[in-house]
A protein has these predicted regions:
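A generic structural signal for alpha->beta connector loops
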Residues: 126, 191, 216, 242-244, ...
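Non-catalytic, well-ordered alpha-helical segments in soluble enzyme domains
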Residues: 231, 235, 239-243
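Short, well-structured beta-strand/strand-turn elements
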Residues: 226, 241-255
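Extracellular/periplasmic catalytic domains that process cell-envelope and extracellular macromolecules
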Residues: 121, 129-133, 158-161, 212-216, ...
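Soluble periplasmic/extracytoplasmic beta-strand elements of cell-envelope proteins
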Residues: 53, 93-95, 137-142, 164-170, ...
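Flexible, low-complexity junctional segments that flank or bridge functional domains
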Residues: 2-165, 169-178, 182-185, 189-195, ...
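Gly/Ser/Thr-rich loop/hinge elements
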Residues: 121-124, 173-222, 226-229, 257-262, ...
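Low-complexity, Gly/Ser/Thr/Pro-rich intrinsically disordered linker/tail segments
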Residues: 293, 298-309
Length: 309
């Protein structure tokens, strides 16, 4: 038995009303889109007009070629309009950097971004875990990234095999804050404050999401002047929240600011400083590193640390 199509049974006037409603809805959406586009063009008129004016009318194209080549590191082959935004971003970020001394704000060209990602992966591959004796483990972390996070997860059982651990963060210049929070959280009770990020208009508190899968009688952290950013954050997270942590080495770098890398079109990206971060004890370390509880600059720091367990 075939089902009847109730829609086709509606009177012609009712069908017409329905189609009119749909037509009006489409018109409203289209009108809103046109209005928003016009408003956007109005707000950005000066920039858009300048972009069209310079890329389409400026006669000294050899000057343009040189500027594009200098800023983007490649010959854009006369495609001034297409590459204009990336060139402007490069110029502006360099000016910001020179004015403020903020060396962490800049444009990535496609080749630079690929190189940076590959170097991050290669650096992470140098992380290692060693069993030192029947009481202690050695964990060296070379950066904070999805690679080192996976490294720790993959070796979770090995990390549980001893009652003491020496974490080597020397020359670790930091990395991704989300990876750092997850990695630090392995040593902390659930919902423990790891860090607070202060943005221009709001703040975000990071808390550990695990129930301390890695517990030790004693944790020793090795640090030096190249221990920076997310590494310093991990040191503060463990040292502020646990009573069994000993910091050995020299004062850390003192980087209490954070950056975000924003992907752009055609493989470009822009990195900019967008936050200050605070330790669980509400301290911003920018310009002032973390002092070790046990200063040490002699040889064989690993044996020195092992003797303190």
């Amino acid at each position: 038995m075939r089902k009847t199509d109730k829609k086709n049974q509606l009177p012609a006037e009712e069908l017409l009303k329905r189609y009119k409603k749909r037509y009006r809805a489409v018109l409203i959406v289209l009108a809103a889109f046109v209005a928003l586009t016009a408003f956007y063009v109005y707000l950005n008129y000066d920039y858009l007009a300048f972009k069209h004016f310079i890329t389409g009318a400026y006669i000294y194209t050899d000057t343009l070629d040189e500027i594009y080549r200098k800023e983007l590191g490649t010959d854009i082959k006369g495609k001034y309009y297409r590459n204009f935004d990336d060139m402007v971003i490069s110029v502006v970020t360099k000016r910001i950097s020179s004015e403020k001394g903020d060396k962490y704000t800049y444009l990535y060209t496609p080749s630079q971004l690929v190189k940076q990602n590959e170097e991050e992966k290669q650096e992470a591959a140098q992380s290692e875990i060693k069993v030192l004796n029947d009481r202690a483990l050695y964990l060296r972390l070379t950066n904070f990234s999805r690679y080192t996070l996976d490294f720790m997860k993959d070796n979770a059982e090995k990390l549980k095999s001893r009652k003491n651990i020496i974490i080597d963060l020397r020359d670790n210049r930091g990395g991704d804050i989300d990876a750092m929070v997850d990695m630090s959280g392995m040593f902390l009770p659930k919902k423990t404050v790891v860090a607070t990020d202060q943005f221009r208009w709001w703040e975000h508190v990071y808390r550990s999401g695990r129930n301390q899968p890695l517990k030790y009688d004693k944790i020793i952290i090795l640090q030096n002047g190249n221990t920076a950013s997310a590494s310093e954050n991990m040191i503060a997270a463990l040292n502020d929240n646990l009573d069994n942590v000993d910091l050995i080495g020299s004062e850390t770098f003192g980087k209490g600011i954070g950056q975000f890398t924003l992907p752009l079109k055609r493989g470009y990206a822009v990195k900019a400083t967008i936050l200050k971060w605070y330790t669980p004890n509400d301290i911003n370390i920018q310009g002032n590193g973390i002092d070790p509880e046990t200063p040490y600059t002699g040889g064989d720091i690993l044996q020195f640390a092992l003797d303190r367990l």
